[in-house]
């Protein structure tokens, strides 16, 4: 079962990306390094509800 998730920057809090994940394979929250346009650099983004 794939669900939509939102990825938020851990430093500024902006929700910059929307993605999908498989809850069966990844039950925990996802953390990815992505580009933050506000800070103009790559930061850690965490899954939010």
From Swiss-Prot:
SUPFAM superfamilies, per the entry: Zn-binding ribosomal proteins
Gene Ontology biological-process annotations: translation
Pfam families with a match to the protein in the record: Ribosomal_L33
Cellular component aspect of the GO annotation: cytoplasm; ribonucleoprotein complex; ribosome
UniProt entry keywords in alphabetical sequence: Ribonucleoprotein, Ribosomal protein
InterPro entries: Ribosomal_bL33, Ribosomal_bL33_CS, Ribosomal_bL33_sf, Ribosomal_zn-bd
Family: Belongs to the bacterial ribosomal protein bL33 family.
Record protein name field: Large ribosomal subunit protein bL33B
């Amino acid at each position: 079962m794939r669900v939509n998730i939102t990825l938020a920057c851990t430093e500024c809090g902006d929700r910059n990306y929307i993605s999908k994940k498989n809850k069966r394979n990844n039950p925990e929250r996802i953390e990815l390094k992505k580009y933050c346009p506000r800070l103009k650099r790559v930061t850690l983004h965490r899954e939010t509800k």
